[in-house]
Amino acid sequence: MRAFLGRKIEAPYSLVDMARDGVALLDHLGHRTAHVVGVSMGGMIAQTMAAHFRDRVASLTSIMSTTGRRTVGWQDPRLAPMMLVQRSSREAYIATSEKLWKMIGSPAYPDTAEAVRERAAETWDRGVSRAGVARQIAAILTQPDRTRELRTVDVPTLVVHGLADKMVHVSGGRATARSISGAELLLVPGM
């Protein structure tokens, strides 16, 4: 909660740590490079990987993400109460997920309520960790602005962002594309 209020916190791990995990996975699989794709927080990690481990990234696709600069890629403030709801049972998790996806889902590409409930049930059954989610949010909220780092990225880059995105405002995608020389920006209406 302190991080949401703009207070300084210490995150247990950072986006750089998670990018390093991606490189470790490449090493484990015996791959020198990969075409790296990330969505939302995954896009932040993919961007970080491309900036910090340039020799390991063959191309970058950043989807519905942002640079870490606080003036772009903001979240619709109406989502905050929904993001902070405690979901302590499977049924509560499914119900809250359904409400959340009604708010953040793509208006032009809606999921059925049944599909959202099934995905939420699968997520709960795999194991939802409130502490893990809190650590990931801390990593996002304590990330530095990557704009300067992104200027060093010199691999083919595609930035995809929905024009109706409530979770990460389209300004985040635009800023990402502007930060990477030669990046292609694909804006999707209704997403």
Residue ranges and their predicted role:
Residues 35, 58-61, 151:
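Residue in the alpha/beta-hydrolase core beta-strand immediately N-terminal to the catalytic nucleophile
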Residues 75-148, 152-155, 175:
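Alpha/beta-hydrolase
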Residues 12, 16-34:
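Conserved acidic catalytic loop of the alpha/beta-hydrolase fold
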Residues 47, 51, 58-90, 132:
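Flexible "cap/lid" loop of the alpha/beta hydrolase fold
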Residues 166-172:
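Conserved alpha/beta-hydrolase "acid-adjacent" motif
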Residues 163-165, 183, 190-191:
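Acidic beta-to-alpha connecting loop that harbors the catalytic carboxylate
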Residues 153, 159-161, 165:
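Short beta-strand/loop motif that positions the catalytic acidic residue
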Residues 38-42, 46:
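Gly/Ala-rich beta-loop-alpha elbow adjacent to hydrolase catalytic centers
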